[in-house]
């Protein structure tokens, strides 16, 4: 149970329940856990429990499957690692910051990662190219288009790299005389309201012309459909 005053736990549990943040959410949340543009409701208005994916990380923990060590004040013991039936770090990614450094790992597809792990177990000398045949790149929860593989390959090879993402869009007829650009997927962790604001600013400053309206119907917290 999460105490209402424990802000860090509140933020963490909200992130773990968001399908647009996690490739495989670890928290099954009931209530408003936020969107790409809005934060979650106060903890007293939400309920949460471990999702099936989280239970897969802790299954058989009481069967001596992993080593235990004392906690910080030696009053309890805690597992050094979780049994983890799947590679959670790769599947859900991670974000962290420390003094002078930061880490951001994007999410990946569960089936692809497990296939690569099984191949690596049977072929310990497998090359990066061999593994990328199974995992060609990140699998972002909200979709979007990854531009180029060079940055991804460098990140896999050295642990440092970057890649660009773009929205996914198509043109469709809005009326007999008008056509619109319909954006169906946005880059990872980019909210539709932010995009609409930037487009309107560009139109207002005359940097972008030919736009008569920008709309984003509310169709779900993890969905996107903007019409320009």
Please report, for each region that a protein language model flagged, where it lies by residue:
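Acidic-residue sensor for enzyme active/binding pockets
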Residues: 1, 47, 78, 185, ...
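Single conserved hydrophobic/aromatic residue that forms the stacking wall/gate
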Residues: 1-12, 222, 226-228
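Generic detector of ordered secondary-structure context
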Residues: 4-5, 42, 178
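Catalytic phosphate-handling regions of large nucleic-acid enzymes and associated NTPases
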Residues: 9-158, 162
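Gly/Lys-enriched N-terminal cap/neck module of very large, oligomeric protein machines
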Residues: 157, 163-225
């Amino acid at each position: 149970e999460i105490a209402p005053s424990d802000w860090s736990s509140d933020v963490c549990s909200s992130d773990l329940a968001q399908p647009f943040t996690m490739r495989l959410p670890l928290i099954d949340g009931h209530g408003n856990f936020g969107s790409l543009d809005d934060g979650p409701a106060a903890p007293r208005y939400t309920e949460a429990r471990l999702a099936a994916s989280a239970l897969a990380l802790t299954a058989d923990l009481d069967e001596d499957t992993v080593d235990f060590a004392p906690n910080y004040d030696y009053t309890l013991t805690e597992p050094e690692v979780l049994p983890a039936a799947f590679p959670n770090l790769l599947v859900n990614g991670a974000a962290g910051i420390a003094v002078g450094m930061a880490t951001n790992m994007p999410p990946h597809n569960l089936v692809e990662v497990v296939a690569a792990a099984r191949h690596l177990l049977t072929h310990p000398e497998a090359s990066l190219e061999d593994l990328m045949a199974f995992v060609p790149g990140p699998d972002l929860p909200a979709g979007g288009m990854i531009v180029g593989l060079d940055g991804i390959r460098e990140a896999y090879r050295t642990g440092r790299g970057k890649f660009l993402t773009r929205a996914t869009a198509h043109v469709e007829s809005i009326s007999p005389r008008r056509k619109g650009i319909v954006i169906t997927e946005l880059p990872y962790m980019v909210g539709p309201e932010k995009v609409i604001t930037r487009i309107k600013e560009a139109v207002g400053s005359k940097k972008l012309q030919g736009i008569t309206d920008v709309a984003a119907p509310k169709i779900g917290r993890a969905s996107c459909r903007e019409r320009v």
